[in-house]
Structure formats: structure tokens, C-alpha cells
Amino acid sequence: MHPQNYDIMAEKDLNRIKVVLVEHKRTNKWLAEQLGRDQATISKWCTNSAQPSLEALIQIAQCLKVDVKELIRFPENENQND
């Protein structure tokens, strides 16, 4: 990844946890209980003010029975050949 791309990505939402929770009619509180995490942590992940670890993303995907890729927002214009 080029440095200029990092600056652009830093300003965008990197995960779709909140969207996927809504699609599955689940709440932050439910996810916090499932993961044994503080509700404030889940809230930060859902608002993209903090990002979960890869391990946490995998656990979230398992709880929601989705592919982990559904929880990640990919930049639309990123050139994968660079």
C-alpha cells in the first residue's frame, strides 16, 4: 500500500460491523455479550473510532454466521496491481 493511500483510508470507515449487525437484527449489547467484551469497545468498533483485531473480526463473523469479508469495507478505487 502506498503512503498516500493510507491517508485516504484513515478518514474512511474500515469496517461494516454496524451495518451487518443491523442486517442480522442484532445489537451492540448482544455482540458484547457473545464476545465477552465491554459494550463501549463494541460501540467504538461500530462507529469506526477504533478497529478490532483480526482475531476479533473472525469471532464477530462466527457469531453472526457471515464471511469475515462482509465485515470489512474495501476501498473502491484501490489498484491491486501496485
Regions found by a protein language model. Name each.
Residues 15-34:
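Short basic helix-loop element that most often maps to the first helix and adjoining turn
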Residues 30, 41, 70:
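Residues in the helix-turn-helix
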Residues 55-70:
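DNA major-groove recognition helix of helix-turn-helix/homeodomain DNA-binding modules
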Residues 26, 37, 66:
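Short glycine/serine/threonine/alanine-rich loop segments
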Residues 11-17, 37, 54:
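Secretory-pathway ectodomains
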Residues 1-10, 19, 24-25, 44, ...:
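Short, charged recognition helix plus adjacent turn
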Residues 28, 39, 54-57:
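Helix-turn-helix DNA-binding elements, focusing on the entry/boundary residues of the two helices
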Residues 36-52:
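Recognition helix of helix-turn-helix/homeodomain-like DNA-binding domains
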